[in-house]
UniProtKB/Swiss-Prot annotation:
Organism of origin: Escherichia coli O7:K1 (strain IAI39 / ExPEC)
Family to which this protein belongs: Belongs to the ZapD family.
Keywords assigned by UniProt, alphabetized: Cell cycle, Cell division, Cytoplasm, Septation
Subunit-level organization: Interacts with FtsZ.
Protein name per Swiss-Prot or TrEMBL: Cell division protein ZapD
Gene encoding the protein: zapD
Top-level division of the source organism's lineage: Bacteria
UniProt function note: Cell division factor that enhances FtsZ-ring assembly. Directly interacts with FtsZ and promotes bundling of FtsZ protofilaments, with a reduction in FtsZ GTPase activity.
């Protein structure tokens, strides 16, 4: 049984958006293959939320800026003794390739927006029970198509996100690896520190404590308050050890 729980908290709006996109893309594949109504609604609801996120900001522009920023950071390690130069060069080339693919790709999510079935389901998702067979006969007949035909269509939908997924995965991996976990101690359930221009907080907490963090702040300063899962009977120790990485 897992004894440590990892919490991540964004310290700016772009990181908040990226983590939401990452979460929703991961959710797209959780219940595949789609074999019934429940699996279909899970998939289409996540597609709909993903398109909503895309429409709120310049996702491609921010990712391209970050790909460029990560390349510049890696270039500062070129020629430094003891650093694996081949690894640095490989990462730089991977970032360049991801940027080229992303910049030449169609508008993010456009393929999904233009799909008739996705559009029909999106219109009904906000209506309680609005995806019944009599409301959405299109979805009803789609669910009775051969499994291979549905699988192929789902794979095509997900593949349309590959330029974004590839770039986002690289960026988030590099950010997460940019800082090590360090042991910290909270006093009376409270901890605060300077962020040092961090984009992301990562916090490892023992499951035994049955506590969760409430995090507030921004890239220059943040505060963490630990709360008991059982709000009535749970207790927060005077001193609590945890691991924190400011990435």
């Amino acid at each position: 049984m897992q004894t440590q729980v990892l919490f991540e908290h964004p310290l700016n709006e772009k990181m908040r958006t990226w983590l939401r996109i990452e979460f929703l893309i991961q959710q797209l594949t959780v219940n595949l293959p789609i074999v019934d109504h429940a699996g279909a609604l899970h998939f289409f609801r996540n597609v709909s939320e993903l398109l909503d996120v895309f429409e709120r900001g310049e996702v491609r522009t921010e990712l391209l800026k970050e790909l460029d920023r990560q390349q510049r950071k890696l270039q500062t390690w070129i020629g430094v003794p003891g650093v694996d130069q081949s690894r640095i060069e490989a990462l730089i080339q991977q970032l360049k390739a991801a940027g080229s693919v992303l910049i030449s790709a169609p508008r993010i999510g456009q393929f999904l927006r233009e799909d008739r079935l996705i559009a029909l389901v999106r219109q009904r998702l906000s209506i309680p029970g609005g995806c019944c067979s009599f409301d959405l006969p299109t979805l009803h007949i789609w669910l009775h198509l051969p499994q291979t035909q549905r699988d192929s269509q789902v794979e095509t939908w997900i593949a349309s996100l590959n330029p974004l997924t590839q770039a986002l995965t690289m960026v988030l991996d590099l950010i997460r690896q940019s800082a090590p976990f360090r042991k910290q101690t909270s006093l009376n359930g409270f901890y605060q520190d300077n962020g040092g221009d961090a984009d992301l907080l990562r916090l490892n907490l023992s499951l035994d404590s049955q506590l969760y963090p409430q995090i507030s702040g921004h890239k220059s300063r943040f505060a963490i308050r630990f709360m008991p899962l059982d709000s009535e009977n749970g207790q927060v120790p005077e001193r609590l050890d945890f691991e924190l990485a400011c990435c």
